[in-house]
Design a protein with these regions (language model features):
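Positively charged n-region of N-terminal signal peptides that target proteins for export
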Residues: 1-4
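Boundary at the C-terminal end of the N-terminal hydrophobic targeting segment
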Residues: 19-25
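Alpha/propeptide regions of enzymes that mature by internal proteolysis
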Residues: 26-218
Length: 218
């Protein structure tokens, strides 16, 4: 089986969120709809939603009890959004967006840390995390050859946020996984508009798992 780089899982930890959670404008989102709604439909979503989780079988891990959702969204203010691309027999990929709080993340940066257990990965933004100890954008997960699309989408998202009119540098954080076994990864089907759509769809509450978003082709 091909090695899947999941460097993000052990690399970026949201330690706390700023108290301010004012809503901001979302100027760039309309661009996502230019691709058509059909591109974002997930015919496998119902399968993912019904699959039992490990704890449903009585298997327990760790010494701490999970939150009520047993998801990253148990942390107040965190939201997650997915875009899943399933087209024909060859496209099985997508995007997962993690937003640590609903305010202006560039202005209200979130403490973070980086540690590489296996450096065979393409985690964009890791060097500034090590240098400054924070993140200033949401976190995007996608396939290995679409990291650049993730960066482009996050830069657009950040520049268009209300209050960021003077921003000239953005440390976009994008993790990846290689879905080339099931997906036409060389086709680079994920575009910046898909990144923006995943950010727009991000919400608190239960999180779809499995073959959805960035996990579709893995």
């Amino acid at each position: 089986m091909k090695h899947f780089s999941l460097l993000f899982i052990v690399s970026v930890f949201i330690l706390s969120a700023p108290a301010s959670t004012q809503a901001q404008s979302h100027g760039p989102y309309d661009a996502a709809h230019n691709l058509g709604e059909s591109a974002f439909q997930n015919p496998l979503a119902s399968v993912s939603a019904k699959r039992p989780r490990m704890r449903d079988y009585g298997i327990r891990t760790g010494v701490m009890q999970p939150g009520p959702l047993n998801a990253i969204t148990d942390v107040k203010g965190v939201s997650v959004g997915h875009v899943t691309l399933v087209e024909g027999d060859s496209v099985r990929t997508g995007v997962t967006a993690i937003i640590p709080h609903p305010g202006n993340i560039f202005r209200e940066k979130v403490p973070a840390a980086f540690w590489a257990g296996n450096g065979f990965g393409k985690l964009a933004g890791s060097t500034q995390i090590k240098e400054l100890g924070n993140i200033e954008t949401p976190v995007i997960l996608t396939n290995t050859l679409s990291v650049s699309a993730g960066v482009e989408g996050l830069v657009t998202y950040t520049l268009e946020r209300s209050g960021n009119g003077d921003v000239q540098s953005v440390n976009a954080v994008v993790g990846e996984t290689n879905d080339g076994e099931l997906n036409d990864i060389r086709g680079r089907h994920v575009k910046a508009a898909h990144i923006l759509d995943a950010l727009k769809k991000a919400a608190p509450g239960p999180v779809a798992e499995g073959n959805v978003g960035a996990g579709t082709g893995t």
